[in-house]
Amino acid sequence: MAITDTRPEVATEAEAPALTTSPNTVFGTGDHTTLGRMWIGAALLLGIAGWVLTALVGVHEIGDADVFTADAAFTMFTLGRVGLVLLVVVPLLLGIATLVVPLQVGANTVAFPRAAAMAFWTWLISAGVLVVANTIDGGFGGSRIEANDMMLASLLGLIFALLVATICLLTTAITLRTPGMSLDRVPATTWATLVGGSMWLLTLPVLAANVVLVYIDHRYGGPSEFGLADNQWAQVSWLVGQPQIYAFVIPVLGMLTDVFTTLGGVRQANRGFVLFGIGAFGVLSFGAYAQPFFYPEVADQALWAGMSLLIVLPVLLLVGAWAATLKGARPPAKAAVGAAGVAVLLLLLAVVAGALYVITPLELRQSGAFAAGQFALVVATGLAGGMAGLYYWSPKLRGRFANEGLAKLSVLAVLGGGTLAGLPLLVLGFANRFDGLADASDALNGIAVAGAALMALALLVTIGALLTASGDTPADDAWGTGQTLEWATASPPVPGNFGELAVVRSSEPLLDATETQEA
């Protein structure tokens, strides 16, 4: 077979299997549901470590504590930044998409399942090497040459793995759609995955090129200064700056749309505007060109400032479309809805902060604290949106609804953690203009540390909510208001996902079927 192991037309319905674990089902699997669970589990665990690391760096910044040496603090800072993106947010969203996208498009599995499995294990091994290399003074600017080379090589492994996983998902969405499902009819999460994955395919290879330049010059020497310790981080830091940082949360926009429409029990109003808004957000998040190391004047260019300002518009468009959809609807007070609402709030704060950052008279570009605060808000957006998706699709993920009490507790934790981790640092960023804020720096940093700790707690509680899921096995349409094809298969999905599917005639095929039966 060229793309899948089993053709959709020969897949048959079966009773949902029990979730069992064995070496074969873990290490040898190409099943997209199992791979999705592994991506999600690893990302949540690494997310806890990433936020703890962020909190420790914040403690170091308070007063004259000097808890760590300057080199150790810098290593922790850079590992925290790269880790929260490449080890947490992107893998978490990839995991959810690996589980959901094949179901949404009516495919029997993810495209290139063996490549998808290879991508996960390559990513996991590379993540382990990255962490080990940083702990033995091999981080950016580290003094141990061999360990530093190992860190750079592990970064290349991470990038390669994420690109392969992305290609598998994009191929699934483009080539394995069920009959009648044109691209303008794909569910919002699949559309956002297409947009986000396309941006990752355009930008992550640029990051890989940066790392290759650093690696070659550092290992073999040469006429350039790419490999010098002081220059390494500067060449890749664009990854966690704006507008590029927005690109890593694009799939969240689709997840929020699906949560609001399904749990609201209504069709998405102005669906075309939603698809356009997600696409526009993706285009405006392209940041591979904004590399101050090679182009110091980039912050003075109208293109960079304009993209940072304009990206607010598609976010407002999406918020307006979601509000119009929910007008008159009464979604249940479930954790999935709460997490989606928190993600919307954090996203609005992040893009407004990004717009303020580029306004020259405010003098925020010289503030590391302001940039750190915006970064925290964007990462928290990705995690809150991911939590909304996890709770929404928990019947497909675990075969049970998540523990609602713990899930709601995690929503409160991510709301408090995200705002506390980001807003105090944004306020501290104005210290260049208001001298009084400098005197409050210790207090503001302390609040940000508490926010980072709350984020770690939120992820821990999320794991608990998913693992303690209980109750009877939900119906195929677990919420009773499903609109898209993932709610037409068992919870959890059976091997092959589907039997014979009817031709899709709109973007909400299950809602069409329900309305036809009622008529």
Segment roles from a protein language model:
Residues 9-25, 56:
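Short, contiguous pre-domain boundary segments
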Residues 364:
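Glycine-rich "HGGG/HGxG" loop immediately N-terminal to the catalytic nucleophile
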Residues 517-519:
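Short, charged juxtamembrane terminal tails flanking transmembrane helices
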Residues 183-186:
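Non-catalytic macromolecular-recognition regions in eukaryotic signaling proteins
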Residues 2, 36-141, 148-174, 188-264, ...:
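Hydrophobic cores of alpha-helical transmembrane segments in multi-pass integral membrane proteins
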Residues 1-10:
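N-terminal acidic, proline/glycine-rich, low-complexity intrinsically disordered segments
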Residues 19-35, 178:
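Cytosolic juxtamembrane amphipathic/interface segments immediately preceding
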